[in-house]
Amino acid sequence: DKPGQWGASYEINGNKYYFGNIHFLTGSSGNTINYAIIKNGTKGIQIDNHVDDETTLTLSNTVISNMSISGIYAQTTNLDVCNTLIYNCDYYAAALTLGGKYNFVHTTLVNYAARHLMPSLVINNHYTRDDEFHVYDLEAHFANSVIHGSLASELMIDEALDYDTQFDFQFENCLLKVDPRFVMDDTTLFKNIVSAPTDLPRFVNPAEGDFRLDTLSAAKDRGNPAYLIDYPLDLDGVERDSLPDLGAYERIEQ
């Protein structure tokens, strides 16, 4: 497995730009990816601007790994993700940029790649082009998920302040690796968060791409059972119990 083996790029004025390996262009909607393995490229999936309220992409039961840039690169789009594992991307597991609407449930976003340079998850609502500053509305919800990796903090929230735009996000029943100085006192934004330095996900064998939970994982039994109605099975097709685990996998003790 080697990142960057596939994916198109182009160059303008000495700057190199990369397409997504699977690329949904502006205006595309109603797309579904289910039970897929996407690996060894530049950007696993890129989703460009949506033009209405319809979901651009529903991504479920999928593994994305070993990308030289990002697993997901989204721009002002409408994206639903569940039962999905994204790991070992050189920059981001998921970069949710230029605003948009995002819903992640029972996902595992982790980065232990040797060249891991940026947090596993980045949320952003702005960019500058030709000296003009652009700001977009953002709604993002993460539930029963794991965000972890080898950096001191695996979450970046990049909001343009003092602009009359919507910037709403919530992390609910998630295991987050963040810097100890990261403030999560607002329970409307961070609800039932597992984040102490000793709260480790303890995956079975991350070096071999096995991100199922070990018996001592801090992610066990920490999920909100309200999501069992829509997500009763994990990425392996295992039935979740009445106290679901965080992330894409449910651990069933033998």
Each predicted region: which residue ranges?
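Beta-strand/loop edge motif enriched in small/polar residues
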Residues: 1-209, 222-231, 235-236, 249-254
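AMP-binding/adenylate-forming core of the ANL superfamily
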Residues: 216-220
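Conserved beta-loop-beta connector loops within the AMP-binding
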Residues: 211-212, 240
